[in-house]
Amino acid sequence: MSCIKMKDNCRNFSLSKWQDTRKPWLILIIVTIGLTCIAHFLFQEYLFMEPCEQCVYIRFDMLVMAIGGMIALINPTNNIIKIFSYSLAFYGIWLGLEHCLTLNHIHEVVHSENPFAGVDGCREIPIYPFNLPLHEWAPSWFLPIGECGMDTPVVPENAYNHLNAFQKFFIGTPPDFENGLYSNGWYLIPSLKFINMAICCLIAFLCCFIVLFAMFIAYVLDKNKPNAKIFALAIVILVLVLKFIGEPKNPNQNIASLNHLNQVVLRYS
């Protein structure tokens, strides 16, 4: 009976109907907010991994996607709601992919034999889309305090005597902190230095894109929604508008990215 019931459920499942429910959007919210909270509370606050500029941008991108999901929860079947929810979700993914690729490039350059080649983006004061001063509104979340391309734990001296066994397992023991799982930076498999944080975030954004794009196509091709193609075009246009109008403008701030990178390399050399 259970096998027959599973087959019936699979037969009745429709991606178009599913994207009209709150479930996929709730999953999106849980994933994006969950990853952002893990980055802040676990890695930053508990394991002393200081976020760099691209890291805080990725947090912003995740929260943009979450806001899109929250809007969809209002009424996921409403076409106007869909315009804003899909647009914000795709916009956040677009930004996230860009920032992950930039972070991975910086990470590879800093850890290469020639760390001065090809890096041109490492600000101490971030510039968010639409020039939102998020680093002033919530500095503990959106102000970068780490060095570009370096995600090794930076433990303050006043915390040396207060580290528990769990923390020491990941960041090592004082004063050198060389025997922890993440002493050489965060990797999915630290012993092999396999898949760094930037690539893991990139995979997360790609997974979200694949699911959302499949939902979007199912919505467009739904024969029961004759106006879906018009609303889909509006979504594409709004994503482009958000991307190009939202590009941050910084006429007054002096960006010495290469000099900052040089300081990073000297610090860790």
Curated annotation (Swiss-Prot):
Transmembrane segments: 25-47, 62-81, 198-220, 230-247
Keyword Oxidoreductase applies: yes
Subcellular location: Cell inner membrane
Top-level taxon in the UniProt lineage: Bacteria
Main localisation: membrane
Any GO CC annotation of this UniProt entry: plasma membrane
Keywords carried by this UniProt record: Cell inner membrane, Cell membrane, Disulfide bond, Electron transport, Membrane, Oxidoreductase, Redox-active center, Transmembrane, Transmembrane helix, Transport
Cleavable signal peptide: none
Pfam families membership: DsbB (PF02600)
GO biological process, one term: protein folding
Disulfide bridge map: C52-C55, C122-C148
GO terms for MF: protein-disulfide reductase activity
Membrane topology annotation: Multi-pass membrane protein
Role summary: Required for disulfide bond formation in some proteins. Part of a redox system composed of DsbI and DsbL that mediates formation of an essential disulfide bond in AssT.
Subunit structure: Interacts with DsbL.
Family to which the UniProt record says this protein belongs: Belongs to the DsbB family. DsbI subfamily.
NCBIfam families: PRK04307.1
Protein name as it appears in the record: Putative protein-disulfide oxidoreductase DsbI
Source species: Campylobacter jejuni subsp. jejuni serotype O:23/36 (strain 81-176)
Lineage of source species: Bacteria, Pseudomonadati, Campylobacterota, Epsilonproteobacteria, Campylobacterales
Protein encoded by which gene: dsbI
